[in-house]
Amino acid sequence: MRRLASALVFASILLGMKTVHAACVGRPTDAAGFASYDYADAAEVKSFAGTKVRVHYATTGQPAPTLTSTRADGVPDTVAFAADTGDGALSKYEAMGYNAVPSDAACASNGGDGLIDIYLVHFTAADGSTHAECDAGKCSSFALVESTFKGKGYANAEEGFKTVVTHELFHAVQNTYKPADAPFWAEGTAQWAMKKVHPELQDFERQMPAFFADPTRSLDAPPGGVTSGFLYGSSVWPLFLSLRQGDDFIRTVFEGEVDGADPLTSIDKALKAKSTSLADEYPLFAAWNVGTGKLKSSGGYPDAAKYPGQATMSLKDGASDITSGLGYFAYKGTLTAEQGITLETDASRNAGVVVPIVDDVLELDQAKKLPANANGSVLVVVSGITTKKSDAKFTIHVGDPIVETPAPGKDAGTPPVTSTPAPTAPAPDDGGCQASGGPTSSSALSAGVVALGLLFRRRRRS
């Protein structure tokens, strides 16, 4: 859903996150309307059918779109544009291998046929929402979309329709796999899909600042508020995954959610099928995010310079902090000689990478997992790697060089595995701000591993 305004709509969505909507919930064209949206003050309500969608609109009153038409059939240009946009988006999603959105013909209130319905309405502060109608595990959907986009921050109505219709219809696609998915994944992937269909649109970038400004917040714990920019800015996570693993990877995650798995569990399973994991990838994702804005980078996001960038702290021996969930911290510094960088922490909760900075460019394709040796200017990122929200303390140690496992040729951006010890079993997590169980010192264990001559082979990505 896009930035919702109605408290009734929000309540409906919250309910939908716990139980699947009953089939045939009613529409704005019904006498009773839908969640405060109706055409009661319209002299006439018309509709225009495309090949996959039907757009409903009022000819008078507050919900009416701009009615100017250059068409022989008299259909308003913006209405026809909305229909063409919807047809194009659904065709693109099907071409990408996603499920087709099922017909709603079985519902008495179905817009007149089995096409996917888009209702043009007036939002006070929002610009769109999508609603699933599910029966026996099969979900169709309909969408509410702003009718004029006046005062909504878009250059014109066409930009608004391309942005919102394309975003909302990916929610309809999502509903064929798992209705009411985790908001960060639902909104993030809808933004990602919108950008895949219309790469020229800038809404993807406009929504990033709130996410980039809050790196210590866990990805799956957005701040309160139905219009949270953090949710939309989290679109960089599916972007990262698609750049690392291919566009089809996102669909694979949705397919893994069909039986009820949460998105992060499905992501981890899909990554492990490619010989990596959430614990391997998330610290690198954090490093990619730091390598944006004014900090030049290579091997990361193609449009990194357009993204907001993130603040860093000074790297020093003994730097310490606490993660919660998938939050992360970034440190920059300069080493005057080769030194070993190790991480003292519960290895089941936190992990880190070190990335060289060469000629003021962050070389993300040279990232190495901690512990590792480094020299010169570097970025060190420490990230949570689980969804546990109790405190997970870490301390960075910068000291004498360590013995590393030689890393064979690697894929771009893949951190080579150094002589990292197997983690000890974590103590039970009591959820307190100082969870029981002391940290595991990766530096001390690493020395033990070297003494035993145990060298771990680098995990290769497929």
Regions found by a protein language model. Name each.
Residues 1-4, 458-462:
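Positively charged n-region of N-terminal signal peptides that target proteins for export
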Residues 7-16, 449-453:
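Bacterial N-terminal signal peptides
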Residues 17-22:
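Sec/Tat signal peptide C-region and signal peptidase I cleavage site
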Residues 51-182, 189, 199-203:
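Juxtacatalytic substrate-recognition/specificity segment
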Residues 134-136, 159, 163, 178-244, ...:
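Acidic/His/Gly-enriched intrinsically disordered linker/tail segments
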Residues 259-425:
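Beta/coil-rich, acidic/histidine-enriched accessory regions frequently appended to metallopeptidases
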Residues 421-443:
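Extracellular Ser/Thr-rich, low-complexity/disordered mucin-like segments
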Residues 442-460:
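A cross-kingdom C-terminal cell-surface attachment/processing module
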